């Protein structure tokens, strides 16, 4: 290895999946590897193997999984909104539960530190472990090795627990304030938007570095032998208008607004209605809500919007399922899309937006907060819907948006002009050059602490005999 290269471990509750954290971790691994660093992964669950990391360096630590028995046990006790019938505890009992939680986290921390020692890890990059309590034991474990053992730690925050109603009401706020995220000297913090940077500075008094979500515009998705049959494989005709929602099915994505948008469009342009196919490409994710899925299905049925849930055929990398059927990536799906919808009420950044841009797909989006602070101003073109909601909580959709959608779907030169412009803007502002600069600057600025951590770890491995 080069003199200034490091052994880096990516730590996450889950990797190899299609959620935003997993996808960004994949990109960081790609960049870090290309810069000469040796990469390890430590995860509670691998949906698929992580590309670019040797199998023997993909370490499974089940206790930090989002679905571990310990996580399910503790989260139902400390987050009342996660239960239909939340338990009630006396203060002494709650103190016992927190002590039990911290003890379990400490045990996981000891195991994690052993992994760091055994593999001589110089620095860990903690992917959202100390921002969102999807893995309470993982968050405690990372906090302990960063503060007790002083292992060089970069906290990569994608979103925060206080932004989620299901976590904002809790019985362990003091603990969460301490570890999610911590503000200890010697650690480094990275956020994905200027808005998150402002909030973290205000709340935690730390000065995070902003490295936005980026997309690989240098290697854009193109039609090839693997994805050429996507339409026929999934039962779509060549002249069907595929409207793709390239997100997981969770309430903050406001998929009901996308359904209403298409219902309005089909009513306004009945000559195109029979060709509309609304596709949701990803699964529920880690914010399970069966009622929400049923609500979406029911709304689509009432409005006559043909709805297709194809998550079982979409994965983070190309493969085949147990029945021998092709698994397509989100990019494979998007290059067959005629239009994408992306109408969230809240997003940490906007992976789906950038994926659509990189695949040269026009996209209808809301002007959600981070879009306004970090994306809107760089010059993308396309239909935008202001984030205004009526008294019933429905997105207010102006007729002008329907007109723009119609032109995109019926005027090919106009569509091509938009997507080519957006591709150039995306490549300049959110391409891998931006990511390379952000990551290399981060590692360079933190390198003294990483080297000090390497020396401390080396000393910890020394045996002394008396």
Predicted regions and their residues:
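A charged, aromatic-enriched C-terminal amphipathic alpha-helix characteristic of glycosyltransferases
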Residues: 396, 400-403, 409-443
């Amino acid at each position: 290895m080069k003199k200034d290269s490091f052994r880096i471990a990516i730590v996450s509750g889950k990797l190899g999946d299609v959620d935003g954290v997993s996808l960004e971790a994949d990109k960081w691994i790609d960049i870090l590897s290309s810069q000469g660093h040796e990469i390890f992964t430590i995860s509670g669950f691998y949906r698929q193997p992580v590309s670019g990391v040797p199998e023997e360096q993909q370490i499974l630590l089940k206790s930090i999984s989002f679905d571990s028995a310990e996580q399910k046990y503790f989260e139902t006790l400390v987050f009342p909104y996660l239960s239909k019938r939340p338990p009630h505890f006396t203060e002494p009992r709650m103190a016992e539960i927190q002590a039990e939680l911290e003890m379990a986290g400490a045990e996981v921390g000891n195991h994690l530190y052993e992994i760091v020692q055994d593999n001589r890890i110089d620095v860990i990059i903690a992917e959202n472990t100390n921002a969102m309590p999807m893995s309470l034991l993982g968050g405690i474990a990372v906090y302990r090795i960063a503060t007790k053992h002083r292992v060089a730690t970069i906290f990569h925050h994608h979103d925060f627990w206080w932004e989620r109603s299901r976590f904002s009401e809790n019985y362990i706020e003091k603990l969460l304030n301490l570890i999610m995220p911590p503000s200890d000297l010697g650690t480094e913090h990275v956020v994905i938007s200027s808005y998150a940077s402002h909030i973290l500075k205000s709340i935690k008094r730390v000065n995070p570095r902003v490295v936005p979500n980026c997309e690989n515009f240098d290697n854009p998705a193109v039609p090839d032998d693997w994805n050429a049959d996507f339409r026929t494989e999934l039962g779509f005709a060549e002249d069907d208008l595929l409207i793709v929602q390239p997100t997981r099915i969770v309430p903050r994505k406001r998929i009901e607004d996308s359904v209403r948008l298409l219902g309005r469009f089909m009513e306004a342009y009945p000559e195109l209605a029979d060709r509309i196919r609304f596709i949701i490409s990803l699964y529920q994710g880690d914010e399970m809500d069966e009622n929400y899925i049923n609500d979406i299905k029911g709304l689509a049925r009432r409005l006559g919007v043909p709805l297709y849930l194809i998550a079982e055929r979409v994965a983070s990398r190309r493969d085949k399922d147990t029945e021998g059927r092709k698994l397509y990536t989100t990019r494979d799906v998007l290059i067959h899309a005629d239009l994408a919808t992306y109408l969230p009420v809240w997003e940490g950044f906007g992976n789906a937006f950038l994926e659509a841009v990189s695949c040269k797909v026009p996209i209808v989006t809301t002007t959600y907060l981070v879009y306004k602070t970090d994306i809107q101003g760089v010059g993308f073109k396309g239909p935008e819907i202001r984030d205004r909601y009526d008294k019933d909580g429905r997105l207010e959709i102006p007729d002008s948006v329907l007109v723009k959608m119609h032109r995109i779907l019926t005027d090919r030169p106009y569509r091509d002009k938009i997507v080519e412009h957006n591709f150039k803007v995306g490549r300049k502002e959110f391409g891998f050059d931006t990511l390379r600069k952000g990551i290399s600057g981060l590692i360079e600025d933190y390198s003294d602490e990483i080297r000090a951590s390497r020396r401390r770890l080396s000393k910890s491995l020394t045996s002394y005999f008396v």
